[in-house]
Regions:
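A conserved mid-protein helix/loop that constitutes part of the nucleotide-sugar donor-binding site
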Residues: 15-23, 197, 201-220, 226, ...
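N-terminal strand-loop element at the rim of the active site
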Residues: 7-15, 19-23, 27-70, 154, ...
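A short, active-site helix/loop in glycosyltransferases that binds the activated sugar's phosphate group
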Residues: 101-103, 142-169, 174-178
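Nucleotide-activated donor-binding/catalytic signature segment of Leloir-type glycosyltransferases, i.e.
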Residues: 243-259
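Aromatic "clamp/platform" in nucleotide-sugar-dependent glycosyltransferases that forms part
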Residues: 260, 279
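Short hydrophobic beta-strand element within catalytic cores of glycosyltransferases
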Residues: 296-299
Length: 370
């Protein structure tokens, strides 16, 4: 008999966690599992990528401002009972915070509960986000049969704040074959075919991604005569302020916001360098995908970076998590063709480790062990 599994996530927007959830549920063995994805809000560009054998449910049609504060007015049990209308063998909160609080409200002893943690909980504020307090977060996470972290760093940070909880590390699922196929498509953007050194980064235009730092570093390098073009793929709340600063710097032709693209891989694969300027990550999906397509990487030293790129920079450059660190890493790659060529070959080698089959099998083994 198939196990009924529910995955709960706030929405299916254009983020890394949302994308890897789609990859995972689409590839779970449907002869073993009856899979449902439920969002709190019926929004997000990733919904269309769910395969027909994955059921989709939305709690609310629209997302409203202040929802994270509003839900704290009610107990997890009250919200769960009003939101989840069926019984499941396993229910999964696929994102820390709100969904983790809600799923903890399931008191059916026959239902196993799993929480996924995608971010490095480096402060008490981050650890308690979505909960009334850190003590409530401890109580909620203690209700889970398993808490999954997407990297060892994420797990270690989680355990600094939460105790006596079963945890494990499972890497994200990437559609490696599909990524490689899409990387071959023609982006139709002329600058990718000239001799200019191209740098790219992918992510929501939000403060945690550090694109403001990347812009400052770009200006500094341009002023030093290190010519290159930066392409950012993504949308978000910082777009207006970034565009204003780009105009102030007079860099409209060399720091380009391309917006959201269904196929970022055709851009990333054609760039000379991928830069992760994030202030905080869990296990960067975008960096993983850059490695899969063989693009050299410079990443700030945030959670998961060394697991991806090596403790001693074997597969890419891990730099100090600061503007100066990003500057030093980019300058080295721009100035030293030998280093760049070395990391191009090492990126392709590391990318082979992220096979879809391996990561899906690890998740299925965890689900079957509950």
């Amino acid at each position: 008999m198939k196990k009924k599994i529910l995955f709960l996530i706030p929405n299916l927007a254009h983020g890394g966690a949302e994308r890897v959830l789609i990859n995972l549920v689409n590839n779970l063995d449907k002869s073993k599992y009856d899979v449902t994805v439920q969002t709190l809000f019926d929004v997000g560009v990733n919904r269309k990528y769910l395969t027909s054998d994955v059921r989709y449910i939305a709690g609310f049609r629209y997302q409203f401002r202040g929802n994270s504060h509003f839900q704290k007015l009610f107990s997890p049990c009250f919200i769960y009972n009003n939101l989840v209308k069926e019984n499941y063998d396993i229910i999964v909160s696929y994102l820390e915070g709100i969904s983790a609080r809600i799923i903890s409200g399931c008191h059916n002893p026959q239902t196993k509960k799993v929480a996924w943690i995608h971010t490095g909980m480096t402060t008490e504020k981050i650890a308690s986000c979505g909960f009334r307090s850190l003590s409530e977060a401890q109580l909620c996470y203690s209700a889970y049969n398993m808490v999954v972290s997407v990297s060892t760093d994420v797990r270690n940070n989680f355990l600094k704040y939460f105790h006596d909880i079963n945890t494990c590390v499972l890497y994200n699922t990437n559609e490696t074959e599909q990524i490689m196929r899409k990387a071959e498509e023609n982006p139709g953007v002329t600058p990718f075919f000239n001799s200019q050194f191209c740098v790219c980064s992918v992510g929501k235009l939000i403060p945690v991604k550090g694109f403001d730092r990347l812009l400052n570093v770009h200006k500094r390098l341009i002023d030093e005569g290190l010519t290159h073009t930066v392409y950012i793929l993504g949308i978000g709340e910082e777009e207006k302020s970034l565009r204003q600063k780009i105009r102030e710097y007079g860099l409209e032709d060399s720091f380009i916001l391309l917006g959201f693209r269904d196929n970022p891989y055709q851009y990333v694969s054609r760039c000379d360098l991928y830069v992760c300027s994030s202030r905080r990550e869990g296990f960067s999906t975008a960096v993983t995908e850059a490695l899969i397509v063989g693009t050299p990487v410079v990443s700030t030293d945030c959670s998961g970076a060394r697991e991806l790129l090596g403790e001693h920079d074997e597969y890419g450059l891990v730099v100090e998590n600061s503007e100066e660190g990003i500057y030093q890493g980019m300058k080295r790659m721009l100035s030293d063709p030998g280093t760049l060529a070395h990391y191009r070959s090492m990126a392709a080698e590391r990318g082979k480790d992220f096979s879809k089959e391996k990561t899906v099998r690890a998740v299925e083994d965890m689900l079957d062990s509950l």
